[in-house]
A protein has these predicted regions:
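C-terminal beta-strand-loop-alpha-helix "lid" module of Rossmann-like NAD(P)-dependent dehydrogenases
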Residues: 1-292
Length: 292
């Protein structure tokens, strides 16, 4: 049976842990609000960029831009977006499981797969595996800005054009709400207008609603790289908001669990203390009776 002193130490440790998890929950909630505002502001722009590029890509030959060209190749790159820090529930675990499943599926089809990793958690996980990590970025979410999207997007665009890989997919957490995230596998290169923008067209956008100057081909050369930069930034913002939401939920659960443990141990402490006092009283009464 634990001593009363050990039980008091346990209660104090649980209370300290509860204070830490509660503080982390409050910090995550504040960061979530900022990240949520950013992604909600960025989504309409990213979707409109998709709409315009969809319209343009239907008017010109796909071979007019290297990022639109479909290749007959077997080299696949998978961009895996994880966090740099833990304590965010199943946020990273869901990503690495989905990424592993997708990579094995590609390999079963005879494809050669390389990885690009965003975040320390994904990097540390895949370094212990047999797959090749071509590029990695860490510290991106400390002060996330559009410059990070330019850096990541520039590297991936250049390597696609050079033929390092023939198709690019990204695995990331899409932000749905403060308590809900969804793992997404999205194809980025080559840009497939019919597949990627069908949902936008279904909302009522028609192909003849734009007039372009100077001409479609010249605008396409500018908008295709810009489109990928915007989508890369949107994906990073989605992941950042999803991470803060997952961490807030995880710390809220940890705080409540710590409270339950404190109640249980405190109750056990009180029962143990009461039993000890009762035993002492019985010893005193027994000793007094023996002296009579």
């Amino acid at each position: 049976m634990p001593s009363l002193q050990n039980l008091r130490r346990k209660i104090a440790a649980f209370k300290n842990t509860q204070k830490i998890t509660k503080a982390m929950k409050m910090v995550a909630a504040a960061k979530l609000k900022r990240s949520q505002d950013r992604i909600l502001a960025a989504r309409p722009y990213a979707h409109k960029m998709r709409d315009v590029l969809n319209n343009l890509s239907q008017r010109v030959n796909r071979s007019s831009h290297p990022l639109l060209q479909k290749r007959v190749g077997k080299k696949i790159e998978v961009l895996v977006v994880t966090s740099d820090r833990g304590l965010c529930g199943g946020f990273n675990g869901n990503i690495v499981r989905k990424s592993t499943e997708f990579v094995r599926q590609c390999e079963s089809q005879g494809l050669q797969v390389n990885l690009s990793i965003v975040g320390r958690k994904g990097r540390d996980y895949f370094r212990r595996r047999t797959w090749t990590i071509r590029q990695e970025w860490t510290g991106v979410f400390d002060k996330l800005s559009f410059e990070h999207a330019l850096d990541i997007g520039g590297d991936l665009t250049d390597n696609f054009v050079k033929g390092t890989f023939d198709e690019l997919y990204v695995v990331y957490n899409e932000f749905k709400s403060a308590i809900q995230q969804r793992v997404i596998v999205e194809k980025l290169f080559p840009v497939d207008a019919a597949a990627e923008f069908g949902a936008v067209q279904a909302e009522g956008t028609t192909g003849g609603s734009y007039l372009y100057e100077p001409d479609e081909a010249e605008l396409l050369n500018v908008l295709v790289p810009k489109h990928f930069q915007i989508q890369a930034y949107r994906i990073l913002l989605e992941s950042a908001a999803a991470e803060h939401g997952a961490r807030m939920a995880a710390m809220d659960g940890a705080t409540r669990n710590a409270g339950e443990l404190i109640k249980k141990v405190t109750l056990y402490y009180n029962k143990t203390r009461q039993a000890a006092i009762t035993k002492e009283l019985m010893d005193i009464v027994g000793g007094a009776e023996a002296l009579k």
